[in-house]
Amino acid sequence: MYLFHLCLVFACVPCPTVQASKLCLGWLWGMDIDPYKEFGSSYQLLNFLPLDFFPDLNALVDTATALYEEELTGREHCSPHHTAIRQALVCWDELTKLIAWMSSNITSEQVRTIIVNHVNDTWGLKVRQSLWFHLSCLTFGQHTVQEFLVSFGVWIRTPAPYRPPNAPILSTLPEHTVIRRRGGARASRSPRRRTPSPRRRRSQSPRRRRSQSPSANC
């Protein structure tokens, strides 16, 4: 995707598409573009997670294909997360083709290794982060992922003697965190079930007959 925009810019074709390509490549001119801002997150929060936290790219691609193949290949717009996953998959496919082309045209094995490692450590990491983030938002919910990133960021920046030994875990986060709304009120997750009150046991003694009034006997 980015290679397409680069070719249009370098070719200097006088058409509106070039202007759009320059906007898409705004990061080349030092623009602060954070693709996670519209989802309530940021690169900074994701960078708190260690590099080995994100699964392998092949595993992420297989997961996205197994869960959302119909939505990703269809024409309809499902959600911004599906669109972001599409873009990440297309970007990684183009980078894979670029690496294959360089591997076949560069004779020096040392240079090939340096280029492949650089792509995996930079763009490969960004694609892994993007796929993990959007797949997690679709699986656990965007708000839950935001809470996890904030909790992990606070945990990792807290000195070891003053923090819990285990880091927050995304899959168990909703069970252990208390989300507070404005005004200090706690957000209720699910209504509590009221335990049924025990029924009163009827007395086994026979009922007393009402005494008849004297007027009734007359």
Curated annotation (Swiss-Prot):
Signal peptide boundaries: 1-20
Domain of life, per lineage: Viruses
Gene Ontology biological process terms from the UniProt entry: microtubule-dependent intracellular transport of viral material towards nucleus; symbiont entry into host cell; viral penetration into host nucleus
Keyword field contains Lyase: no
Single annotated GO MF: structural molecule activity
Annotated stretches, region: HBEAG: 26-28
Region called Disordered, residue ranges: 180-218
Sequence repeat ranges per the UniProt record: 190-196, 197-204, 205-212
InterPro entries: Hepatitis_B_virus_capsid_N (IPR013195), Hepatitis_core (IPR002006), Viral_capsid_core_dom_sf_HBV (IPR036459)
Region feature (3 X 8 AA repeats of S-P-R-R-R-R-S-Q): 190-212
Comp. bias regions, Basic residues: 180-211
Posttranslational mods: Phosphorylated. Cleaved by host furin.
Keyword Magnesium set for record: no
Cell compartment(s), UniProt: Secreted; Host nucleus
Residues with site note (Cleavage): R189, S190
Similarity comment text for this entry: Belongs to the orthohepadnavirus precore antigen family.
Record-linked HAMAP family: HBV_HBEAG
Subunit structure of this chain's protein: Homodimerizes.
Its biological purpose: May regulate immune response to the intracellular capsid in acting as a T-cell tolerogen, by having an immunoregulatory effect which prevents destruction of infected cells by cytotoxic T-cells. This immune regulation may predispose to chronicity during perinatal infections and prevent severe liver injury during adult infections.
Protein name: External core antigen
